Amino acid sequence: MVAPPWDLPPDTSGIIPVIVHPSTGFGTGHHATTRLCLRALQIQPIQGRHVTDVGTGSAVLAITAAKLNAASVMAIENDLDAASAGRSNIAVNGVGAVMTFLVGNVRTVVTRPASCVLASLSGALLTNSARSIARCPEPGGILIVSGLTMQEESRVVHALEPIVWVDERLYEGNWVALVVKTRYRENLPHSTSRPGDVTSPFLEPF
């Protein structure tokens, strides 16, 4: 359950309460793309694993991963205002002990591959950044992407291949989330770089 503190029920047993202060639109948890990611995240074996949230915004997904007992969560955001909102939400949820918050870009993730990587971005950004984002999980790891529409789905899937394979697709209205799993390194082609991969703000130095 994602809500501001004044909307939480007195008894939160049986739910995962994520407190979010409504701010300047960096994610309140009520958009279909966030809901899809939350659905996908809660059925993954997160406990004891390392999670990275790329483009964390208000940190709803990162906080949820922490409350699902992830061993550690790295939240990455390249917008200073969004980063401020995310840090505030992490503090109010009391999950700072397992969190690392970095203001930067997706290149930061490469230094520490994660068991599960979350990327709720736009369809265009996912397409342009696919090869870099898909290499963030460790071999055999999980990548959950959202923010794409049904019209963008085939382009995003094509851009992610052959580094990952789609394990599950979730839909809400016109929005899509993909649960994809990374191939082991020995199953990858020698080179998967393409012209135009490094075209998004997430791939440029902050």
Residue spans of the language-model regions?
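Short, charged, solvent-exposed linker or helix-capping segments at domain edges/interfaces
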Residues: D11-I15, H30, L188-R194
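Conserved SAM/SAH cofactor-binding pocket of Class I
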Residues: T24, T28-V106, V110
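Generic structural signal for well-ordered alpha-helical scaffold segments
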Residues: D7, L38-Q42, A134
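Structural motif
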Residues: M1, P17-V18, H50, S72, ...
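S-adenosylmethionine
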Residues: Q44, N78-F206
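Non-catalytic substrate-recognition/targeting regions of SAM-dependent transferases
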Residues: M1-G27
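Short, solvent-exposed coil/turn segments
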Residues: S13, V60, G173-W175
